[in-house]
UniProtKB/Swiss-Prot annotation:
Cofactor remark: Binds 2 Zn(2+) ions per subunit. One is catalytic and the other provides a structural contribution.
Coiled coil: none
EC number: 4.1.2.13
Reaction equation(s) it catalyzes: beta-D-fructose 1,6-bisphosphate = D-glyceraldehyde 3-phosphate + dihydroxyacetone phosphate
Co-factor requirement: Zn(2+)
KW Transmembrane (keyword) present: no
Chain positions recorded as D-glyceraldehyde 3-phosphate binding sites: 50
Residue numbers binding Zn(2+) 1: 84, 198, 232
Gene assigned in the entry: cbbAC
Gene Ontology molecular function terms on file: fructose-bisphosphate aldolase activity; zinc ion binding
Name this polypeptide is given: Fructose-bisphosphate aldolase, chromosomal
Protein backbone atom coordinates (compact mmCIF):
# COMPACT_ATOMS: atom_id res chain seq x y z
CA UNK A 1 0.00 0.00 0.00
CA UNK A 2 1.28 3.45 -0.83
CA UNK A 3 1.96 5.93 1.94
CA UNK A 4 -1.09 8.04 2.76
CA UNK A 5 -1.64 11.52 4.15
CA UNK A 6 -2.19 12.20 7.82
CA UNK A 7 -5.38 14.05 6.91
CA UNK A 8 -6.91 10.96 5.32
CA UNK A 9 -6.07 8.78 8.32
CA UNK A 10 -7.28 11.25 10.94
CA UNK A 11 -10.47 11.95 8.99
CA UNK A 12 -11.15 8.21 9.13
CA UNK A 13 -10.33 8.11 12.84
CA UNK A 14 -12.68 11.02 13.44
CA UNK A 15 -15.48 9.38 11.50
CA UNK A 16 -15.19 6.12 13.44
CA UNK A 17 -14.21 7.55 16.83
CA UNK A 18 -10.75 6.13 17.46
CA UNK A 19 -7.29 7.49 18.13
CA UNK A 20 -4.04 6.68 16.34
CA UNK A 21 -0.78 6.24 18.24
CA UNK A 22 2.07 7.99 16.43
CA UNK A 23 5.33 6.21 17.16
CA UNK A 24 8.72 7.87 16.85
CA UNK A 25 11.23 5.70 15.03
CA UNK A 26 14.95 5.82 14.36
CA UNK A 27 16.01 2.22 13.70
CA UNK A 28 15.08 -1.03 12.02
CA UNK A 29 13.94 -2.86 15.15
CA UNK A 30 11.44 -0.16 16.06
CA UNK A 31 9.93 -0.16 12.58
CA UNK A 32 9.75 -3.97 12.57
CA UNK A 33 8.03 -3.97 15.97
CA UNK A 34 5.43 -1.40 14.97
CA UNK A 35 4.63 -2.99 11.63
CA UNK A 36 4.38 -6.51 13.07
CA UNK A 37 1.96 -5.27 15.74
CA UNK A 38 -0.01 -3.38 13.09
CA UNK A 39 -0.25 -6.47 10.90
CA UNK A 40 -1.36 -8.60 13.83
CA UNK A 41 -4.09 -6.14 14.85
CA UNK A 42 -5.04 -4.75 11.40
CA UNK A 43 -4.13 -1.23 12.49
CA UNK A 44 -3.11 1.83 10.44
CA UNK A 45 0.28 3.30 11.30
CA UNK A 46 1.89 6.68 11.84
CA UNK A 47 5.68 6.45 11.75
CA UNK A 48 7.24 9.75 12.75
CA UNK A 49 10.80 10.96 12.79
CA UNK A 50 12.28 13.88 14.69
CA UNK A 51 15.32 15.84 13.56
CA UNK A 52 17.36 13.76 16.00
CA UNK A 53 16.06 10.53 14.48
CA UNK A 54 16.87 11.69 10.97
CA UNK A 55 20.36 12.68 12.05
CA UNK A 56 20.93 9.36 13.82
CA UNK A 57 19.60 7.04 11.12
CA UNK A 58 20.30 9.18 8.07
CA UNK A 59 17.49 10.63 5.97
CA UNK A 60 17.89 8.15 3.11
CA UNK A 61 18.21 5.11 5.39
CA UNK A 62 15.10 6.10 7.31
CA UNK A 63 13.07 6.77 4.17
CA UNK A 64 13.98 3.45 2.61
CA UNK A 65 13.23 1.52 5.80
CA UNK A 66 9.73 3.01 5.77
CA UNK A 67 9.32 2.22 2.07
CA UNK A 68 10.42 -1.34 2.87
CA UNK A 69 7.75 -1.47 5.58
CA UNK A 70 5.11 -0.38 3.06
CA UNK A 71 6.28 -3.04 0.60
CA UNK A 72 6.40 -5.78 3.23
CA UNK A 73 3.00 -4.89 4.69
CA UNK A 74 0.95 -3.85 1.64
CA UNK A 75 -2.36 -4.03 3.51
CA UNK A 76 -1.37 -1.51 6.20
CA UNK A 77 -1.84 2.24 5.54
CA UNK A 78 1.25 4.17 6.67
CA UNK A 79 1.72 7.87 7.29
CA UNK A 80 5.34 9.09 7.27
CA UNK A 81 5.30 12.16 9.51
CA UNK A 82 8.02 14.69 10.30
CA UNK A 83 7.94 15.50 14.01
CA UNK A 84 8.69 19.02 15.31
CA UNK A 85 9.86 20.80 12.18
CA UNK A 86 11.81 23.88 13.20
CA UNK A 87 11.30 25.97 10.05
CA UNK A 88 9.50 26.04 6.71
CA UNK A 89 12.79 25.05 5.05
CA UNK A 90 13.05 21.91 7.18
CA UNK A 91 9.46 21.01 6.34
CA UNK A 92 10.13 21.55 2.64
CA UNK A 93 13.17 19.26 2.78
CA UNK A 94 11.11 16.54 4.46
CA UNK A 95 8.39 16.82 1.82
CA UNK A 96 11.00 16.45 -0.90
CA UNK A 97 12.30 13.38 0.92
CA UNK A 98 8.89 11.70 0.75
CA UNK A 99 7.18 12.56 4.02
CA UNK A 100 3.40 12.63 3.61
CA UNK A 101 2.86 14.81 6.66
CA UNK A 102 4.92 17.47 8.43
CA UNK A 103 4.70 19.27 11.73
CA UNK A 104 5.63 22.94 11.78
CA UNK A 105 6.37 23.66 15.43
CA UNK A 106 6.09 27.42 15.46
CA UNK A 107 5.50 27.48 19.22
CA UNK A 108 9.30 27.69 19.44
CA UNK A 109 11.81 29.69 17.45
CA UNK A 110 14.07 27.90 15.01
CA UNK A 111 16.53 26.95 17.77
CA UNK A 112 13.72 24.81 19.28
CA UNK A 113 14.52 26.33 22.68
CA UNK A 114 13.08 29.84 22.64
CA UNK A 115 9.30 30.27 22.96
CA UNK A 116 7.97 32.27 20.02
CA UNK A 117 5.26 34.89 19.85
CA UNK A 118 1.83 34.15 18.43
CA UNK A 119 2.22 36.10 15.18
CA UNK A 120 5.46 34.27 14.37
CA UNK A 121 3.76 30.92 14.97
CA UNK A 122 0.85 31.85 12.71
CA UNK A 123 3.07 33.09 9.89
CA UNK A 124 5.51 30.15 9.68
CA UNK A 125 2.71 27.60 10.04
CA UNK A 126 0.60 29.33 7.38
CA UNK A 127 3.54 29.27 4.96
CA UNK A 128 4.06 25.55 5.48
CA UNK A 129 0.34 24.83 4.98
CA UNK A 130 0.33 26.78 1.73
CA UNK A 131 3.36 24.86 0.44
CA UNK A 132 2.36 21.39 1.67
CA UNK A 133 -1.33 21.46 0.79
CA UNK A 134 -0.52 22.31 -2.81
CA UNK A 135 0.78 18.76 -3.20
CA UNK A 136 -1.53 16.96 -0.76
CA UNK A 137 0.83 16.76 2.21
CA UNK A 138 -0.77 17.26 5.63
CA UNK A 139 0.35 19.78 8.25
CA UNK A 140 0.27 19.62 12.04
CA UNK A 141 0.76 22.84 14.00
CA UNK A 142 1.35 23.46 17.69
CA UNK A 143 -0.16 26.11 19.94
CA UNK A 144 1.18 26.49 23.46
CA UNK A 145 4.42 25.01 24.82
CA UNK A 146 4.76 21.46 26.07
CA UNK A 147 5.73 21.53 29.72
CA UNK A 148 5.08 20.25 33.22
CA UNK A 149 2.44 22.12 35.21
CA UNK A 150 4.22 20.76 38.30
CA UNK A 151 7.62 22.28 37.62
CA UNK A 152 7.22 24.79 34.82
CA UNK A 153 9.91 22.93 32.88
CA UNK A 154 9.42 21.77 29.31
CA UNK A 155 11.67 18.75 29.34
CA UNK A 156 13.84 17.97 26.33
CA UNK A 157 13.88 15.26 23.72
CA UNK A 158 16.05 15.16 20.61
CA UNK A 159 16.95 18.81 21.10
CA UNK A 160 13.35 20.03 21.32
CA UNK A 161 12.09 21.77 24.46
CA UNK A 162 11.57 25.32 25.67
CA UNK A 163 14.38 26.60 27.88
CA UNK A 164 13.78 28.25 31.24
CA UNK A 165 10.69 28.27 33.42
CA UNK A 166 7.34 28.55 31.67
CA UNK A 167 4.16 30.12 33.03
CA UNK A 168 0.94 28.13 33.30
CA UNK A 169 -0.57 30.22 30.52
CA UNK A 170 2.27 29.26 28.18
CA UNK A 171 1.72 25.57 28.94
CA UNK A 172 -2.03 25.58 28.34
CA UNK A 173 -3.51 26.14 24.89
CA UNK A 174 -6.10 28.93 24.85
CA UNK A 175 -9.31 27.63 23.20
CA UNK A 176 -10.28 30.95 21.59
CA UNK A 177 -6.77 31.45 20.28
CA UNK A 178 -6.87 27.91 18.87
CA UNK A 179 -9.90 28.87 16.79
CA UNK A 180 -8.11 31.93 15.42
CA UNK A 181 -4.93 29.93 14.77
CA UNK A 182 -6.71 27.27 12.75
CA UNK A 183 -8.64 29.87 10.75
CA UNK A 184 -5.47 31.79 9.87
CA UNK A 185 -3.19 28.83 9.13
CA UNK A 186 -5.40 26.03 7.78
CA UNK A 187 -3.66 23.24 9.71
CA UNK A 188 -5.06 19.72 9.43
CA UNK A 189 -4.18 18.84 13.01
CA UNK A 190 -3.27 20.85 16.09
CA UNK A 191 -0.94 19.77 18.88
CA UNK A 192 -2.23 21.24 22.13
CA UNK A 193 -0.60 21.98 25.47
CA UNK A 194 -2.34 20.44 28.50
CA UNK A 195 0.55 19.73 30.87
CA UNK A 196 2.30 16.85 29.12
CA UNK A 197 6.01 16.93 28.36
CA UNK A 198 8.65 14.97 26.49
CA UNK A 199 10.75 12.22 28.04
CA UNK A 200 10.24 9.75 30.88
CA UNK A 201 10.02 12.29 33.71
CA UNK A 202 6.56 13.73 33.10
CA UNK A 203 4.97 13.63 36.57
CA UNK A 204 6.30 12.98 40.06
CA UNK A 205 2.98 11.36 41.01
CA UNK A 206 0.02 9.84 39.26
CA UNK A 207 -1.42 12.85 37.42
CA UNK A 208 -4.63 14.53 38.51
CA UNK A 209 -6.48 17.51 37.09
CA UNK A 210 -4.15 20.09 38.63
CA UNK A 211 -1.17 18.84 36.61
CA UNK A 212 -2.87 17.21 33.61
CA UNK A 213 -5.55 19.50 32.20
CA UNK A 214 -7.68 16.98 30.32
CA UNK A 215 -10.78 19.15 30.52
CA UNK A 216 -8.98 21.74 28.40
CA UNK A 217 -9.27 19.31 25.47
CA UNK A 218 -13.06 19.52 25.52
CA UNK A 219 -12.93 23.32 25.58
CA UNK A 220 -10.58 23.39 22.59
CA UNK A 221 -12.58 20.82 20.65
CA UNK A 222 -15.73 22.90 21.11
CA UNK A 223 -13.97 25.81 19.41
CA UNK A 224 -12.46 23.80 16.52
CA UNK A 225 -14.63 20.67 16.12
CA UNK A 226 -13.41 20.01 12.56
CA UNK A 227 -9.69 20.09 13.42
CA UNK A 228 -7.98 16.93 14.64
CA UNK A 229 -6.31 17.36 18.03
CA UNK A 230 -2.91 15.91 18.91
CA UNK A 231 -1.49 14.96 22.31
CA UNK A 232 2.30 15.16 22.49
CA UNK A 233 4.38 13.70 25.30
CA UNK A 234 1.77 11.00 25.87
CA UNK A 235 3.79 7.94 26.78
CA UNK A 236 2.29 6.15 29.77
CA UNK A 237 5.70 5.15 31.23
CA UNK A 238 4.77 1.52 32.07
CA UNK A 239 5.79 0.78 35.64
CA UNK A 240 6.52 -2.86 34.80
CA UNK A 241 9.24 -1.82 32.37
CA UNK A 242 10.73 0.61 34.88
CA UNK A 243 10.98 -2.28 37.34
CA UNK A 244 12.74 -4.49 34.79
CA UNK A 245 15.23 -1.73 33.99
CA UNK A 246 15.97 -1.23 37.70
CA UNK A 247 16.17 -4.97 38.34
CA UNK A 248 18.87 -5.33 35.71
CA UNK A 249 21.08 -2.43 36.74
CA UNK A 250 19.30 0.65 35.43
CA UNK A 251 18.82 3.79 37.48
CA UNK A 252 15.49 5.46 36.70
CA UNK A 253 13.87 7.45 39.48
CA UNK A 254 10.19 7.29 40.37
CA UNK A 255 8.16 8.79 37.56
CA UNK A 256 4.73 8.57 35.98
CA UNK A 257 3.34 9.11 32.51
CA UNK A 258 -0.05 9.82 31.01
CA UNK A 259 -2.40 6.97 32.03
CA UNK A 260 -4.01 5.12 29.14
CA UNK A 261 -7.44 5.79 30.63
CA UNK A 262 -6.77 9.54 30.45
CA UNK A 263 -5.73 9.21 26.80
CA UNK A 264 -9.00 7.39 26.13
CA UNK A 265 -10.84 10.35 27.69
CA UNK A 266 -8.94 12.59 25.30
CA UNK A 267 -9.93 10.47 22.32
CA UNK A 268 -13.58 10.80 23.29
CA UNK A 269 -13.10 14.58 23.38
CA UNK A 270 -11.53 14.92 19.93
CA UNK A 271 -7.91 13.74 20.15
CA UNK A 272 -7.04 11.71 17.06
CA UNK A 273 -3.22 11.48 17.15
CA UNK A 274 -1.30 10.43 20.26
CA UNK A 275 2.49 10.78 20.21
CA UNK A 276 4.45 7.97 21.88
CA UNK A 277 8.23 7.58 22.06
CA UNK A 278 9.39 6.96 25.63
CA UNK A 279 7.29 3.81 26.11
CA UNK A 280 9.09 2.08 23.24
CA UNK A 281 12.47 3.26 24.52
CA UNK A 282 11.74 1.89 27.99
CA UNK A 283 10.54 -1.47 26.68
CA UNK A 284 13.57 -1.88 24.43
CA UNK A 285 16.01 -0.82 27.14
CA UNK A 286 14.47 -3.17 29.68
CA UNK A 287 14.48 -6.08 27.24
CA UNK A 288 18.10 -5.48 26.23
CA UNK A 289 19.28 -5.26 29.84
CA UNK A 290 17.48 -8.48 30.73
CA UNK A 291 18.74 -10.31 27.64
CA UNK A 292 22.37 -9.41 28.28
CA UNK A 293 22.08 -10.31 31.95
CA UNK A 294 20.37 -13.64 31.32
CA UNK A 295 23.17 -14.87 29.06
CA UNK A 296 26.43 -13.13 29.90
CA UNK A 297 28.37 -15.24 27.40
CA UNK A 298 26.26 -14.09 24.45
CA UNK A 299 28.00 -11.74 22.02
CA UNK A 300 25.61 -11.78 19.06
CA UNK A 301 23.79 -8.42 19.27
CA UNK A 302 20.88 -9.82 17.29
CA UNK A 303 19.75 -11.77 20.35
CA UNK A 304 19.41 -8.63 22.46
CA UNK A 305 17.92 -6.65 19.59
CA UNK A 306 15.34 -9.37 18.97
CA UNK A 307 14.36 -9.18 22.64
CA UNK A 308 14.11 -5.40 22.29
CA UNK A 309 11.87 -5.76 19.26
CA UNK A 310 9.56 -8.14 21.12
CA UNK A 311 9.33 -5.75 24.05
CA UNK A 312 8.49 -2.82 21.80
CA UNK A 313 5.95 -4.88 19.86
CA UNK A 314 4.08 -5.75 23.05
CA UNK A 315 3.73 -2.06 23.97
CA UNK A 316 2.66 -1.07 20.45
CA UNK A 317 0.03 -3.80 20.25
CA UNK A 318 -1.49 -2.71 23.55
CA UNK A 319 -1.77 0.89 22.32
CA UNK A 320 -3.36 -0.10 19.00
CA UNK A 321 -5.96 -2.14 20.84
CA UNK A 322 -6.62 0.40 23.59
CA UNK A 323 -7.05 3.38 21.24
CA UNK A 324 -9.52 1.58 18.96
CA UNK A 325 -7.12 1.26 16.00
CA UNK A 326 -7.37 -2.50 15.76
CA UNK A 327 -9.43 -3.62 12.78
CA UNK A 328 -9.34 -0.23 11.05
CA UNK A 329 -6.54 -0.70 8.51
CA UNK A 330 -8.58 -2.85 6.14
CA UNK A 331 -11.36 -0.23 6.14
CA UNK A 332 -9.11 2.49 4.68
CA UNK A 333 -8.75 2.87 0.92
CA UNK A 334 -5.65 4.95 0.12
CA UNK A 335 -6.18 8.29 -1.60
CA UNK A 336 -3.24 9.52 -3.71
CA UNK A 337 -1.73 12.80 -2.57
CA UNK A 338 -2.63 14.37 -5.92
CA UNK A 339 -6.32 13.84 -5.14
CA UNK A 340 -5.87 15.03 -1.56
CA UNK A 341 -4.37 18.27 -2.90
CA UNK A 342 -7.59 19.04 -4.75
CA UNK A 343 -9.48 19.07 -1.45
CA UNK A 344 -7.58 22.19 -0.44
CA UNK A 345 -8.17 24.15 -3.64
Amino acid sequence: MALISLRQLLDHAGEFGYGVPAFNVNNLEQIHAIMEAAQETDSPVILQASAGARKYAGEAYLRHMVLAAAETHPDIPIVLHQDHGSSPAICQASIRSGFTSVMMDGSLREDMKTPSDYDYNVEVTRRVCEMAHAIGVSVEGELGCLGSLETGQAGEEDGVGAAGTLSHDMMLTDPAQARDFVARTGVDALAIAIGTSHGAYKFSRKPTGDILAMDRIREIHEQIPDTHLVMHGSSSVPQEWLEIIRQYGGDIKETYGVPVEEILRGIKMGVRKVNIDTDIRLAMTGAIRKSLSDDRSEFDPRKALLAAKKGARSVVKLRFEAFGCAGQASRIKPVPLERVAKLYS
